[in-house]
A protein has these predicted regions:
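Structural motif
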Residues: 39-45, 92-103, 154-161, 203-212, ...
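Post-signal peptide N-terminal segment of secreted/secretory-pathway proteins
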Residues: 42-151, 155-156
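Repeated scaffold domains used in trafficking and secretory/extracellular systems
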Residues: 67-80, 124-143, 178-192, 227-239, ...
């Protein structure tokens, strides 16, 4: 089925059914989204004219046919007009895992001290590496100009970038593998010089372990540090500090950019998030960053909270905003960006596996007074969105900020739709139906 447009004009606030009319207009953004059930990547140019928005769904030329029973797309990242998406299978990588690199067809046009994206070509697959030797990645990050892929079954990770992918004689030569981390790996990379790679172990000698790995020409595994609790899942770098997500709270260390410290000389700092009603320590599973802040969610239902850490502080602590959700709802990892005027905003989906028709989106103004302190963060009234379709780690909503931060685009997996929502008045400005179950979303735009 091709996408059908639901156009909301500026003169009307209600959505009046569907339309197959696609207004000719300027391209606001080029969108890429994953269809979870089909294991395909789709794309469309989001266009805007005086009549409203239009979107026409397309397949990507050369995208591999995956086994929908045993292979899935995982995280994806974009840089310099190149998009990389990870591939994972259900047999520890034996069926075929790895990555696919897509030329987005987008180019940067210089305008004095800034640039604009132009879209002269349709997207196409540049290269791919899917075989039994890629370690079954679950996580693919972007730090600076680097794509960093966790090779879980190989106890290591691969670093590549847009230039290395484009210049490589073969896909196997596009990246460099490093040993570090184990089981189900999460990663932080500091200034392109050092990686912190986690171990997932709950107990034993590798519980709480983080390998510190020098990157570049003189690469080597430097040493490892240990957090006080295990089940590490989550890591990030912000403002000269590296943060980790163990089973209890948050841990952080000063980034060792030269990898000249030793395990004994590194202080692993611990921050508490709080406890649940049974007295168990709260944790998180992933971080996002914006400017000097690390942002994450913790807790469930009425105990849900959006948390922030000011990484620029010498002695950072956890601040939080209570987000009292329904008993069957939980918060997805926040999506962070800049709204109108450059103010930081967090998009927080409250999702219910039992009743996805009740899913909501909270827009949180992180710094209403603009002083750089998030202690005055405030959530707006929730927006009713389409349903999720949660299956394990998949089937969640996603969102991207559109140019100038005045609108966002969101995916609704449960009813196969993509919406455009205003951040000014929180109205739904357009709805588009699409094939399959749209989940993860990436935007190429100004």
């Amino acid at each position: 089925m091709t996408i059908r447009s639901f156009i909301l004009t500026f003169a009307a606030l209600s959505l009046m059914g569907s339309s197959s009319v696609h207004a000719e207009g300027r391209t606001v953004a080029r969108l890429f989204w994953q269809g979870h059930q089909s294991a395909k990547l789709k794309w469309a140019d989001l266009q805007k004219s005086k009549d409203g928005y239009a979107l026409s769904e397309n397949d990507i030329s050369g995208f591999p046919e995956l086994d929908t029973d045993d292979q899935t797309l995982v995280q994806m990242q974009a840089d310099d007009g190149l998009l990389v998406v990870g591939v994972r299978d259900e047999a520890n990588g034996d069926i075929g895992s790895g990555w696919v690199a897509i030329e987005t067809g987008a180019t940067q046009e210089a305008h004095g001290d800034h640039f604009h994206w132009r879209f002269p070509e349709p997207p196409s697959v540049h290269s791919k590496l899917i075989d039994s030797g890629q370690g079954n990645p679950a996580h693919l990050y972007r730090y600076g100009k680097s794509f960093v892929m966790a090779n879980d079954q190989r106890n290591g990770f691969t670093v590549l970038n847009s230039k290395s992918v484009r210049d490589a004689d073969s896909p196997a030569e596009a990246g460099r593998f490093y040993e570090g981390g184990g089981g189900h790996i999460t990663l932080a990379v500091a200034e392109g010089k050092v990686a912190y790679s986690t171990w997932i172990d709950r107990e034993g000698e590798n519980a709480g372990r983080v390998d510190v790995v020098r990157l570049g020409e003189n690469a080597e595994k430097g040493y490892h540090i240990t957090c006080p609790t295990g089940v590490l899942h989550g890591a990030t770098y912000c403002d000269d500090k590296v943060f980790f997500a163990p089973s209890d709270g948050v841990c952080w260390v000063h980034a060792d950019l030269e990898v000249d410290d030793t395990a004994d000389s590194v202080t692993v700092n611990h921050l508490e998030i709080g406890t649940d009603p049974e007295g168990n320590p709260l944790r998180t599973g992933a971080f996002t960053t914006i400017d000097h802040a690390v942002v994450f969610t913790s807790g469930k239902a009425e105990q849900s909270k959006l948390c922030f850490i000011d990484a620029s502080c010498d002695t950072p602590d956890v601040q939080s905003l209570s987000m009292k959700l329904a008993s069957d709802q939980s918060l997805k990892t926040p999506i962070i960006g800049k709204g109108s005027g450059g103010r930081p905003i967090a998009l927080c989906f409250a999702e219910s596996k039992e009743a996805p028709e009740t899913d909501q989106l909270y827009v949180v103004d992180l710094d209403p007074d603009g002083n750089g302190d998030y202690s005055d963060a405030k959530a707006r009234e929730p927006i009713a969105v389409g349903p999720s379709q949660i299956e394990g780690h998949f089937g969640h909503h996603d969102a991207v900020f559109l140019p100038r931060g005045r609108q966002i685009a969101v995916t609704n997996p449960g009813d196969a739709s993509i919406w455009v929502i205003s951040l000014t008045d929180q109205s739904v400005q357009a709805k588009f139906e699409c094939e399959g179950t749209p989940t993860s979303l990436v935007s190429i735009s100004d």
